[in-house]
């Protein structure tokens, strides 16, 4: 199925539904939720998925797992998606929180095949086997640390959201502590309690995740490093590898599979 609303088919009696959708540039899907679990795969472009818990960046050729009944907003940058909508009973192992994952070559091929299946595919035969393989393959995907958790504390959340709009790797914790009228030590405890991360680690991940949103536009590493406040491109690349375990080139056109169809 391609370019049809999931609401038109969501109640079909099939464990998995696959839909391919093309979106205009800078398209935003306002907050919504699905009865089914969703696997949202970026065939092209980059997505940013937001929930009350945080924000997840999804580079090209990766996917985000979205639990059922999870309100979320999606910002699209040059995106064509391949989505799976899965009955919760068919995937009891599905994570309770959004998760960005690497997509194996096998799952990618299965996704491309599934979107061209009939909505009410036969429950026995080739298409049912494709669905069964998809469910098996989904269980073993490698998570990527591309989430930026957001605190529930209103004051700290406002500061975090402002930082995400204009991240700076050298933004000092003292500025945040002053804004909240607390000591830096108290800020550190609050940050860890609210996000599960230290201030320094959260700041670095936020910067690296932000850089991924710029890569599809061809922004060079030198400019990304300067914009984020890194001393030089080498420092940015080292930080990138520390967070994601691979260099920026792994997330650019040269490091991705060919275009999906």
Feature map (PLM): residue ranges:
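Generic protein-terminus/edge-of-domain signal
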Residues: 1-46
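Short acidic-glycine-tyrosine-enriched beta hairpin
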Residues: 53-68
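Short hydrophobic/aromatic patch on the recognition helix
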Residues: 61, 187, 191, 235-236, ...
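Amphipathic alpha-helical segments enriched in hydrophobic/aromatic residues interleaved with Lys/Arg
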Residues: 92-165
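A short, Lys/Arg-enriched amphipathic alpha-helix from helix-turn-helix/homeodomain DNA-binding modules
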Residues: 130-131, 143-173, 177-180, 197, ...
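Terminal helix-turn-helix DNA-binding modules in bacterial transcription factors
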Residues: 174, 193-233, 237, 253-261
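Alpha-helical residues within the helix-turn-helix
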Residues: 178, 189, 193, 226-227, ...
